[in-house]
Amino acid sequence: MILKSFLLGNLLSLCMKIRNSVVVVGLYYGFITTFSIGPSYLFLLRARVMEEGTEKEVSATTGFIMGQFMMLISIYYTPLHLALGRPHTITVLVLPYLLFHFFWNNHKHFFSYRSTTRNSMRNLSIQCVFLNNLIFQLFNHFILPSSTLARLVNIYMFRCNNKMLFVTSSFVGWLIGHILFMKWVGLVLFWIRQNHSIRSNKYIKYLVSELRKSMARILSILLFITCVYYLGRIPSPIFTKKLKETSETGETEEETDVEIERTSETKGTEQEKEGSTEEDPSLFCSEEKGDPDKIDEREGVNGKEKTKDHFNLKERWYNNKTVYRDQEDNTAYGDGNQEDWELKALKLKEEKKLFWFEKPFITFLFDYQRWNRPFRYIENDQFANTVRNEMSQYFFNTCPSDGKRVISFTYPPSLSVFGEMIQKKMSLCGMKELYPKDKNLYNHWVSTNEQKRDKVSKEFINRIEALYGGDIVLQKRVRLCNDRDEKECLPKMSDPFLNGSYRGTIKELYSNSIINDPITSTYNSGEKFWINRIHSLLFCDLNDQAIRNKSSEIQEIKKKIPQRLYRLTTDLEQDEGEDERESVEFPEIRSRKTKHMVIYADNEENTNIFTHTGAGTTYDPENDQMEEVDVIRYTQKPDFRRDLIKGSMRAQRRKTVTWEMLQINLHSPLFLDRIDKNPFFYFDISRIINLIFRDWTKKKPEFQTSNFKEETKKEDEIEETWETIAFGQVIRGFLLVTQSILRKYIVLPSLIIAKNLVRMLLFQLPEWYEDFKEWSREMHIKCTYHGVQLSERKFPKNWLKAGIQIKILFPFYLKPWRKSKLRSHHIDHPMKKRKKQNSCFLTVWGMETDLPFGPARKGPSFFEPIHKELEKKFKKGKKKWFLFVRIFKEKKIWVIKRVLFIKGVMKELTKANPVFLFGLKRVYDGSENRKDSISNNKTISESPIRKSPIRTGSMDWTNSSLTERKRKDLSDKTTTIRDQIERIRITRDKKTNFLTIDMNISPNETSYSDKRSESQKPIWQVSKRRSTRLLYKWRYFMKSFIERIHRNVFLCMINLPRINTQLFLESTKKIIDKYISNDEKNQSGIDEKNKKKIHFIFISTRKLLSTISNKKTNNSKIHCSLSQAYVFYKLSQKPGIKKYRLGSLFQYRRAYSIKDRIKDYLEIERIFHSESKHKKPGNFGMNEWKNWLIGNYQYNFSYTRWSRLDPQKWRNKVNEQCMIKNKDSKKTDSYSYEKDPLINHERHILYSADLLQNHKKKLSKRYRYDLLSYRYINFGNNSSIYRSLLQVNEEQRILILSSHSHIIHKYEQLNLPAISDYLEERFIVDMEKKTDRKYFDLRIIKFWSRRNTNTDMDLRINTNKKNNTGTNYYQMIDKKDLIYLTSYQEIYPRNKENNFFDWMGMNEELLYRRISNLALWFFPELVLLNDAYKTKPWTIPIRLLLFNGKKKITETQKMNENKKRDLGILSNQKKYLELGTRDREEKKWWDQEDLRPDTKYQEYFGSDVKNQKDVELDVWYREGKSREQEDYTDINKSRKKKQSKSNKEAELDLLLKRYLLFQFRWDDSLKKKMINNIKLYSLLLRLMDPKKIVISSIQRGEMWLDIMLIHKDLPLTKLKKGGVFTMEPLRLSRKWNGQFLMYQTLSISLVHKIKQQTDRRYRETKYIDENFFDLFIPRNGRVFVNGDNKNYDLFVPENISALRRRRELRILSRLNPGKGNINIIFSNRKKIQNCKPFLDRGKHLETDTNKAIKFKLFLWPNHRLEDLACMNRYWFDTNNGTRFSMSRIRMYPRFGIS
């Protein structure tokens, strides 16, 4: 096994070495580069396909490989790299080459003239093939960009050490891949040539041959298309726009490119001569001011490789204008060696003269100062020119990391230059090198880390041992002390062990003026010091005296802002004349293509259009000589040239795709799937299936989406159609004018005449006047092509060519009748009222549209009101008809019943008469048999009655044929069966005791055959027979008749009161249940149908009705019988509650005594048994308690809701959640308030008082129920909290109530709103989604109005101002707290003394507590803060609230202050409450308020308060006064500066200066209103009578009158009042505490169940349950924290150390390369278990120590990603926001408990 593992380990290590080797990586990259097939492969494939010979194939392949090899060599050979990497070099080479290439393909005979085949390599065509492949391989990376794979070589260059080996291996890999690719191409071509099917088919053979012949032309076309495709997006660099440079000052620091020749653009030759190479201090502090042009960091001149830093230094020689020079002799003092510096300057000057001819040639080909990236000009208002970017993207240098030297690509350039300068000085001074080349650097680094780790871990173990000894040792900041015993430490400003805010801020000790001042300067005095020690190290020159003499010229090092050379202007700025400098010949920046449309031209001279009245207007129309007013119109075509700098180099966009032949916009491939495209072309299978099978399903979408895109697309299509048609605008213009004339003067008057004629024919009054009056309001305004309104009569300029629109104002719609204002039923509801259509545009078809070229809209229909009216009348007639039919049916049924009753009576009469009046046949009776009927027939036939007149008829019937007899027998059988069925039904109905009137019980009832035969007899015979039968059976008939009357009438009369009483009681019970427990009925979840019928509830209901009627006068706390019954009934139905005994309840003699009926019922239900009093119920656990609480929706929260709520907040705010208002309960009142709030105000106040009184009764009743439930549930507990109050005396009961007020009196502490206005729990969460709108109801706001006090709205007329007189409606809502703060103690003085913490009366009894429910009209997020302040006002400890000051404002003072107040509230006592200005109020406040604290305050704090009271008050008074004085001194200063400012304006300026941010709100709404005003003003200038349209525009809200007041010198106050200027305070960021951060860390793994049940007061008992870790469940809760805040940090062991030591210990424990990254200290369980005695002792932290150790091990993970974020920032220098994305991933494991 050991051998196998050894071999396996070696194999893996070998594989890892092979995989990470440079050769393998190079081969891999080179092989992949083969697949980046670019345009250079065109020539290579051309030689293969065209079969031009083996020589050309070999030359093409050779040139291709040589080109790739040259590209690899150029990486190490700098001149070749510069030659191939310069854009102007490529420009010079490519354009002639392309010209030569196309000339070569078209004129081959010129080059192949006199060519022989003797030596084929001398043939010019073969050499050209070689050059084609060679040159295009070089061009591939620059002109024709290839894919990213080709550039992977350069990326990996900075990662490997052996770069030459990597380049060689990558070239070999590329060569292998290329050979394989060419072999594959050859095999494919060979297969095509040898394929029999291709050769046998003459068509394919012909196509192949033609393809081979035209291959050269096809490849040339492809090459040309490719070149145009890539070059088309880049302007030609030869003809560029040369921009004019601006005049530069000494403050501007120029940035030029790295080439020496470019310095000729700088200004001033003296500054080029002067300067310093190494003494430039700006190099030490300035960052690399990189330009985007500086992408290639390695440059070279004369074949020598130089780093970028050398060129940066040379830039300073020419460009730096802040060098230190002597202004008198113009000599530099750089090194002190002045002659060497002059020689260098002369050499550079000669070099510059040598290259004079290069400057115009190079700038002609390629402008180095081109605006290429960014190519859009972002103007900066603070500076004249744009600011350059000051940090280059990449700078490469080596730096030590993890014991190795690694290349860093974001190394600070200034640090690199500084390091080189230090290195040179150290080598000159003979010192050691700064970076020693030690081979054991890595080992040294590892050993140093191990020592640090051991040191820190040893310190950590010592601290744990100190904790074990009993001391709480938490590391604090170390101070530098002189004497440890006396603790004499250095001050924090000078302590080197402290950092951050402890050290204070560094102040500037001197300025330039102080240094340069010869009197105050300290350089010439005896104290001569160096500003910087590094400065002395760098400038260690022998001749340092000269430097000291010139040190007065040293200025403060400061950073100059680099600016570009140009100050650019746009086309629009030049047209508008906004540019203040000299007008240039052409603007440099292209603006959007615009057209200026003149909307007003002043043809008359000195015409004063505007009339100005009022003293405040400063506008002078004489100075404003405005000839024309024009509006800029932008073209709707896409303009890619906007905001581009002319001559700028466009960036080649590599991340754009084109998928259409003609594409309008550029798109990124990231959003390709979101763009509408052809699904058949892109193989979008799902969309194709939807298109095919969409009509089959015939399913409409669930939500109808707006077709906004389709509508805009249709509008554009219509507009494009008119523009593409020849003379389209002319035709459209004439059509619009024709439609306008037809509509206005022909169509609409004709319709009006026709309508009124029809009304006259229908005998109705005509409406000539109303119709023609509305018709005259319709106006047709001529507009421009884009909708700018001009005039009603004047056409726009060139409207036939440019186009025209006609806008209709107040369009006329024909109506069948006019609604009368007196008819109230026609008035629409304000919510249902549609927005009136006031304007539209006319189309060429005479239709109306909202927008030009938009879809036609439907106007109000003429026949729709008629149709609706007819429908109403038809419905009314239909109702009347159905009512008539129903009444007719009822009458018909009544008549039928009466007829049947009479027939029954007649039957009975005939049955009772035995004598036959006439000689007729006896009627067949179903009860007799067949023989009886035959014998009867015989007797009848033999009787002497045959002599009667019907004798022949009877003789014919007896002598009938055989068929008639058979038919008679069949009918007899059917009647017999029917009679039997009817008899069975009668007997069955008799058994069920159901009696009906229509049913005949007698057995001698006439059968079906009797009825049939009777219909054939005369009436007199029937009546005779029935009368005889009735006389015969009269006794039986009377008997049955009396029985029917008894059963149907008397029994119903007896049972009717009982049934009605029962129904009445049940309905009354439902109403009372709903009244008493409206919330419980919706929450209990118990079906009303399955409730037990408790009979004594019905009996007690009647008694309760009398108590409810007297509810206002009854103030007693005695329970009614229904309340007890209801409580016990609820207790009996709870499934989690066992029916235990309540013996002590029945023995209690006070208000909780129980009726005898309830006792009996409880004994029947086995809730109470007297013989089992000694048994105690079991203790109820949390699960039973949770099941008990599920019945109420307030308690039925999800785990997420439980995790968000604290138990105490939950108990104090069970019903103060942000719940939805039940709209039905207050709908009518809220609507009446919307109509007239002032009229209904008094009615609402009265209703609110009743609601408050009812609400208090509900609270007291609910409290009694809950108290009884508490005692019942917790009867078996031994704790004093649940002790039964029935077994103690009165004193003990009061003691228990006072000690546990949070349990018993919890509902008295609540201010609960009415529950009848709320819905169930499922609507609580998504409150804003469910409601349609927020209702505003004044009932919600309860003021501090007592029983005999109401608060009215103050309606005062302010007559103090002379000019403006108006009525001010002051709302009580905004100042609702002010009412109580000032008038409370006057109206309701308190007899008892105030507590110290009774701020603003917060701890008052519930009787005087107001009920606020602001969640329904205010923002619900702010209501939580308001409620928190009401429940715990000490969370905002304002010093003013500490003292119960009492106002002493008299009536006369109030009346005098009325002149300067804006608020007024009139109570019933006619007391005004006003606020004055700040200075007067503060003065009165200090003078008139009693600031002495209460006696409770002194008793609470003892004697210390008496001693410190005066001191604290004095300090507080003096602080307030000093602050006020400072504020007023600032105000006085501002008054001296601006005498015109008032007191309020000065205060506003002071407020803005200190505390507020302000901005000018130029939002979309303001912009839109300004544009609407411009349109309206342009329209008004051309109207003949603009008065009507002005009034209508103001009424419609189109004209914003506030903007008309804005002119040039508008003061700040007017802007603020108009809403243009807004003030917002600074927002404070939230500071999280340690507990919250710990909860955020652990909440992903743990949550404690105790958080769902326990109260915060119980957590402070410093006790934890034994089953602590069994209660952990995943997520949805906060972490359990012990109540002792002092030892809270001991849960996390790393909190023992300081923050810096923690991070250091964690990182060093991970950076342990020699031992497999194992943290021995913290992974060893035995060492941690040594802390067991410490964990067991004191504080009752845990009982199970092993579980606690597991918990602490969990809090100490081996790998913390938060540390990786810090390491990522400082080690890898990724200074962006992505480093914190790793810290969002929590990799803490789930805490498993064994």
Curated annotation (Swiss-Prot):
User: Which Pfam family, an example, fits this chain?
Assistant: Ycf1
Q: Which domain of life is it from?
A: Eukaryota
Q: Which InterPro entries match?
A: TIC214
Q: Which portions of the chain have biased composition (kind: Acidic residues)? A: 248-258
Which compartments does it reside in?
A: Plastid, Chloroplast inner membrane
- How does this chain sit within the bilayer? Multi-pass membrane protein
**According to its record, what are the GO cellular component terms?**
chloroplast inner membrane
For this UniProt record, the keywords arranged alphabetically read as follows: Chloroplast, Membrane, Plastid, Plastid inner membrane, Protein transport, Transmembrane, Transmembrane helix, Transport
Biased composition regions of type Basic and acidic residues, renumbered to the chain: 259-276, 286-307
PANTHER family in the record, alphabetically? PROTEIN TIC 214, PROTEIN TIC 214-RELATED
Q: What does this protein do?
A: Involved in protein precursor import into chloroplasts. May be part of an intermediate translocation complex acting as a protein-conducting channel at the inner envelope.
Q: How does it assemble?
A: Part of the Tic complex.
Q: Which family does it belong to?
A: Belongs to the TIC214 family.
Task: Provide the protein name.
Answer: Protein TIC 214
Species this chain originates from: Amborella trichopoda
